[in-house]
């Protein structure tokens, strides 16, 4: 039996590994397309080797979900090359609002009156991001374009989450694991044409790519999949919020990159609203006698 303490430490480790993605992406001299392709290629191999459950039961329903995840992986890397890591992760964290808005059409799940407050809070957070302009710096040379790419990654991430829920309704086991493998494999293939040819590939670049594929994605997913079934959903969700919280810290340490006050306020509002909404949903499910 898995130790409760060990399971929680594994989720914390996964969140912290995920959070280093922004800083690591900025460390390579490669293009965003090259980083996205090579990182995902390594991650797909690692996940396939490390997670036996990801090798079984593939079917056509995986494809649209894997495409959405592949787009998320690519867009997130491209966004991190152009805007601050804080902006990239905070804007991607808006995904739950799109899941709510798409729910009536994709999942036949209605938007409840109580969800309106969450939608309004996230909308206000988004408004703070896009009000005014941000100054370009070496680690974030085109914040406006990067913010749009990060926003797009939030939408594709929402499509992936909705797809996983759709797969779950069809009783598919380990859908998340298989999607992680297929999505990374697709991201590798889709970004590869734009990644070639490669010029000036250094030992430092190789180290960054290996770290991203082996640890930031591969080991993080291994920790998460080992632990997630042993930790209550709300507790796991709360611990995984370490990712958007820690990501700006790593880039500040490495590059002295600081998000604007507006972006920081918007990010805190989005994360706080998500946590409150998750807690409220958990309480409502408990009151209804649902797991």
Predicted regions and their residues:
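Juxtamembrane helix-entry segments on the extracytoplasmic side of multipass membrane proteins
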Residues: 4-7, 29-37, 55-59, 131-156, ...
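Transmembrane alpha-helical segments that form core, pore/gating elements
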Residues: 15, 47, 99-100, 136-198, ...
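Hydrophobic transmembrane alpha-helices of multi-pass small-molecule transport proteins
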Residues: 47, 69, 101, 114-134, ...
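Hydrophobic/aromatic residues within transmembrane alpha-helices
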Residues: 28, 35, 79, 105-107, ...
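Glycine-/small-residue-enriched transmembrane alpha-helix faces in small-molecule transporters
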Residues: 1-37, 67, 75, 124, ...
